[in-house]
């Protein structure tokens, strides 16, 4: 959520920044609502003061033996007017809040201006795509060769965009996740965290999935609609529970940064992606991801974004997978991001780079929703923290990249050296 003071006092400046990302802020409506809020606020305060004064007069008149009935009727009338004004003010504030919750974050001035993914800017490349002297197989074909990817079984069990992994492919998938967790905890300073895969609506509001993206989530529907679990949804990413761990907290600045990582399944409806990436593991309703989250002081958040992106890059480099870093343009960034870097890994069968990590600085956008604050021991005044999140990495897409980049002419898959300790020293699948 944006700073309400900015929306009140500098709506034109906010509108200009939001226009860079293709969002039209209705400044006239905001101004009209703000003027009405001021009127109602003053009216409510005046009515409250008048009622208090008249109530005090009742006691004084009673002490003098005067007839208090006219005063009592006047106080009752003032009370009714006050209740009506309060109700109107509450409804207006709710309308303003609903509008504010639907407004995306403003882009940082360093973000390239653009309309969509075609306007993203390549920042760097690492590694050279391998040249094959045989016909490249995609990961689906390789998975079927090794009886490791069974999409038909998943359709029978659930439906489209799910997979059953088996045998050595399932083992490789697990090895990737374990390698990522070990790297982030042992070398990058993150604390491993296990989180619930179901969260309540307050948690989803905190990180910005609600109210705008309710359709992208899988919601629980218990038989008893009054049950607490009717307020649950499956997590679209571990960012959601990890970041909300600091909701309604005041953190000593000496304890920052807080760096957390978690391996979890992620659940997404993929609304709006009908017909895209229907083959294979690229776009699934359920997929595993190792997530990184940082909670930092505001003045260091851009440095933290560079650090976090570097942590995701290190995973790819140790796996020997060619990639490129893309600075997302204003029109392609996520709802809550003020700046985002995507990492795209080389996928030989598609002869292109595909997203495998997205690292974002969210600024104080989530912290304001969550009321996550920090302060120094010497200063009682609090301020909002900045939050960052990043994929370190999407495990299924990493599996795709390893299978395709390390395939051999005979169909075997070479296991990257850094993964062999997790595969009992095995060098090849097949």
Swiss-Prot record:
Pfam families: Seryl_tRNA_N, tRNA-synt_2b. Its EC number is 6.1.1.11. It is an enzyme of class 6 (ligase). ATP binds at residues 268-270, 355-358. GO terms for molecular function: ATP binding; serine-tRNA ligase activity. It catalyses: tRNA(Ser) + L-serine + ATP = L-seryl-tRNA(Ser) + AMP + diphosphate + H(+); tRNA(Sec) + L-serine + ATP = L-seryl-tRNA(Sec) + AMP + diphosphate + H(+). Pathway: Aminoacyl-tRNA biosynthesis; selenocysteinyl-tRNA(Sec) biosynthesis; L-seryl-tRNA(Sec) from L-serine and tRNA(Sec): step 1/1. It is found in: Cytoplasm. Keywords: Aminoacyl-tRNA synthetase, ATP-binding, Cytoplasm, Ligase, Nucleotide-binding, Protein biosynthesis. L-serine binds at residues 237-239, 291, 391. Its main location: cytoplasm. GO terms for biological process: selenocysteine biosynthetic process; seryl-tRNA aminoacylation. One of its GO terms (cellular component) is cytoplasm. Consists of two distinct domains, a catalytic core and a N-terminal extension that is involved in tRNA binding. Catalyzes the attachment of serine to tRNA(Ser). Is also able to aminoacylate tRNA(Sec) with serine, to form the misacylated tRNA L-seryl-tRNA(Sec), which will be further converted into selenocysteinyl-tRNA(Sec). Belongs to the class-II aminoacyl-tRNA synthetase family. Type-1 seryl-tRNA synthetase subfamily. Homodimer. The tRNA molecule binds across the dimer. This is Serine--tRNA ligase. It comes from Enterobacter sp. (strain 638).
């Amino acid at each position: 959520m944006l700073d309400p003071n900015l929306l009140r006092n500098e709506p034109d400046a906010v509108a200009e920044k939001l226009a860079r990302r293709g969002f039209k802020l209705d400044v006239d409506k905001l101004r009209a609502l703000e003027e009405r809020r001021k009127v109602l606020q003053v009216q409510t305060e005046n009515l409250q003061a008048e009622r208090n004064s008249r109530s005090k007069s009742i006691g004084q008149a009673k002490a003098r033996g005067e007839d208090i009935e006219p005063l009592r009727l006047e106080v009752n009338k003032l009370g009714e007017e006050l209740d009506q004004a309060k109700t109107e003010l509450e409804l207006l504030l709710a309308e303003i809040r609903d509008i504010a919750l639907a407004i995306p974050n403003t882009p940082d001035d360093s973000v390239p201006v653009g309309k969509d993914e075609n306007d993203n800017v390549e920042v760097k490349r690492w590694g050279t795509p391998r040249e094959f002297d045989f016909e490249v197989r995609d990961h689906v074909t390789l998975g079927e060769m090794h009886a490791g990817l069974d999409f038909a079984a998943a359709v029978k069990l659930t439906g489209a965009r799910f997979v059953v992994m088996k045998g050595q492919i399932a083992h490789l998938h697990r090895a990737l996740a374990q390698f990522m967790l070990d790297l982030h905890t042992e070398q990058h300073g993150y604390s491993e965290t296990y989180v619930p895969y179901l969260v309540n609506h307050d948690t989803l509001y905190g990180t910005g999935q609600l109210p705008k993206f309710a359709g992208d989530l899988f919601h629980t529907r218990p038989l008893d609609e009054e049950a607490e679990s009717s307020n649950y949804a499956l997590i679209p990413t571990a960012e959601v529970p990890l970041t909300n761990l600091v909701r309604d907290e005041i953190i000593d600045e000496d304890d920052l940064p807080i760096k957390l990582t978690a391996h979890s399944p992620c659940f997404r409806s993929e609304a709006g992606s009908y017909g895209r990436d229907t083959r294979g593991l690229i776009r699934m309703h359920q997929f595993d991801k190792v997530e990184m989250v940082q909670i930092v002081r505001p003045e260091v958040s851009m440095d933290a974004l560079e650090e976090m992106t570097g942590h995701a890059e290190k995973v790819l480099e140790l796996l020997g997978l060619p990639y490129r870093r893309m600075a997302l343009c204003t029109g392609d960034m996520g709802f809550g991001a003020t700046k985002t870097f995507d990492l795209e890994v080389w996928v030989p069968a598609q002869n292109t780079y595909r997203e495998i990590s997205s690292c974002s600085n969210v600024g104080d956008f989530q912290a304001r929703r969550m009321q996550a604050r920090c302060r120094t021991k010497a200063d009682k005044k609090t301020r909002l923290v900045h939050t960052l999140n990043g994929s370190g990495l999407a495990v299924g897409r990493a599996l795709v990249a390893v299978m395709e980049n390390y395939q051999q002419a005979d169909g075997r898959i070479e296991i990257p050296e850094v993964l062999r300790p997790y595969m009992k020293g095995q060098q090849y699948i097949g």
